[in-house]
């Protein structure tokens, strides 16, 4: 969930990614039970810190028309991908625009997957860099790994590998050294900004321009091979199939009425997954789409112990994100936008998308 409009005129120094992260206060068992009762207990004090920006209202994405996505048909039989993963149990492949979309919009369902012993393969399409470069993107990646550690109850190191896919894309994959049923794969494409117009530091281009054909290709911020629209679709389809999913979770697609006001990157990724999932052999009913920013307009449905645990996970991530961070549960819940989203989580099936 990248929520920065434009880089500030004088960026402050980024936090050292090697700095010790917040120690988790684990309430995982409470989340895994799937019970949400009562109010948030014993909110601790703490000051909300905006290192780069200050907001008084939740962010809202610009509505930009998006061209239809036409996936390239896969060869049959499908060649084995270098990204192919070991078969798992009740496997979910989760495809998100930014590192933290899952812990904000799809929790406590996300924690339930991890706590149940099922297999989870997560893919982040953009770097969520907000025009601030690879170092900042890597801090966000470290934050999401820390959040997963909080949910799984381990602090063992993660192994890192670079993979070149059949599509020609190069991705980075992280796998816990003690838990191979989990993985995080990142493409590191440039953040598209709330405006959908990208950032000056990355050529003012993002997923919206790529899909609409106003730029011919996007260059990952880690200097990986450039991807045009068809190669991006091939890459996402390849990664989905490589994860051997029983289920897919992702952002709400652009063509849904629930996408109005969402981050343009969220809409692009949701539409991309919706287009390529059938090519990857996934039935429409196996895909769940999570409402992003507009979830704030829905009734609160995450409360009590489930909210406590969700906020713990988010605060663990936020301790690594030097742009917007919160110190304690009260501060996280007071943060414009984040406080509303953390109290809500709405997944929609294909039949519930309200397609426009």
Give names to the regions the model predicted.
Residues 22-65:
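N-terminal twin-arginine translocation
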